[in-house]
Design a protein with these regions (language model features):
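Extracellular/periplasmic bilobal clamshell ligand-binding domains
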Residues: 306-342
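Early extracytoplasmic/lumenal segment of secretory-pathway proteins
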Residues: 28-92
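Periplasmic solute-binding protein
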Residues: 87-98, 117-145, 173-174, 256-262
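Ligand-binding pocket segment of bilobal, Venus flytrap-like solute-binding proteins
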Residues: 168, 175, 179-247
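Short beta-strand->loop
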Residues: 34-37, 99-108, 118-119, 122-123, 134-136, 142, 148, 218, ...
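A structural signal for short loop-to-beta-strand junctions that line the ligand-binding cleft
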Residues: 77-82, 100-132, 148, 158-161
């Protein structure tokens, strides 16, 4: 009932926003994609896939309202595949009953088990890690090395983060629940809140800017925002003002998340969709993805970007993202209980 109520308020506006789009028609030589990722990132890969297979890829950029659109279209949806970012968005689509399972030996070969839904409802395509960044001027190298140390009282008034209920922060908190239990995770989140320099606000890049401006000394961000800032002349000084810390390298490793894909429940071009999924999980598809967006490949042995090679290898947390997804509701509740955003 809660989901229906939410859709009644928001869904009509979302659906109307798509009315002007040309319908995607099912075809034996096509595959239809709803994508959270921007066309400039994924279209080059689709073009190569089409050249190799003759299968045309029709894509719709749907950063907002993807789940609501799929719900409204129901069995008449032309969508075969969904591309999105964060385990939360993938699991939300699955939990809404909008995906179907896929069995493929190529996925088992190319995608580690912790980046796959156990029954094949979603698959990670690239990984991103949630790193700690610290002021080069005000924090000594090695002074903070773990997520747990973010609660140290010596950092009081010195940390910036985005909203505690944003999907990236929710996933991190969910991983803390998985590793430490809910009670300890709540203490951790409350301790982090007590060390904030300001009310949570802005995106990940805004936290790095705040360090450059002296608002805070430490922030928690997704690693690829460093790549994005280094490509923007205005933001290069922000990136150059911080050191990157891959957390928990002497323990479980850095928290990981994914961009991923899922086969829709009513996919009209199922066979073509699976071919595209397998291409994107292949060495060729993975390398194209990684070179475009600065994220890491899920497939082992794929060449990294020059910047990733400069950063060097790091230890990844091997926690299953399906477990992270299961703890998301509790993580959101904890953010409310500690009044993280207040």
């Amino acid at each position: 009932m809660k989901m229906k109520s939410k859709f009644s308020v928001f869904g009509a506006a979302v659906v109307s926003a798509f009315i002007g789009l040309t319908p995607l028609l099912a075809s034996a030589g096509e595959v239809n994609v709803y994508s959270y990722r921007k066309p400039k990132l994924i279209d080059p890969m689709f073009e190569v896939f089409t050249e190799q297979t003759g299968i045309k890829v029709n894509s719709v950029f749907a950063k907002k309202g993807m789940l609501e659109r799929l719900q409204s279209e129901g069995a008449n949806s032309p969508a075969d595949l969904v591309f999105t970012v964060d385990i939360g968005r993938l699991s939300d689509i699955q939990n809404a009953g909008l995906t179907q399972s896929v069995n493929s030996a190529r996925f088992e070969e190319n995608i580690p088990e912790n980046y796959r839904e156990p029954k094949g409802h979603w698959f990670g395509l690239t990984t991103r890690t949630r790193i700690i960044v610290t002021s080069k001027d005000r924090v000594k190298p090695g002074e903070i090395t773990t997520y747990e140390q973010l609660t140290d009282p010596k950092w009081k008034g010195r940390i910036c983060t985005r909203s505690g209920k944003h999907v990236y922060m929710v996933a991190l908190t969910a991983s803390m629940i998985a590793h430490h239990g809910e009670a300890e995770a709540k203490k951790w989140l409350a301790g982090l809140k007590s060390n904030l320099a300001r009310k949570p606000q802005g995106n990940d890049r805004a936290q790095v800017k705040a360090i450059k401006e002296g608002v805070c000394d430490i922030a928690v961000i997704n690693h690829y925002y460093m790549v994005k800032m280094l490509k923007d002349p205005e933001q290069v000084p922000w990136a150059n003002s911080v050191n990157m810390v891959f957390p928990n390298q002497d323990g479980r490793g850095a928290h990981m998340n994914v961009s991923g894909m899922a086969l829709t429940k009513h996919a009209p071009n199922r066979a073509n969709a699976i071919k595209l999924m397998e291409f994107l999980a292949s060495a060729q598809g993975q390398e194209m993805y990684v070179q475009k967006n600065g994220e890491y490949p899920v497939k082992a042995g794929v060449p990294l970007s020059p910047l990733q090679n400069f950063w060097g290898p790091f230890k990844e947390d091997s926690l299953s993202l399906a477990v992270v997804a299961d703890n998301r509701a509790a993580a959101i509740r904890l953010a409310d209980e500690v009044r993280y955003n207040d």
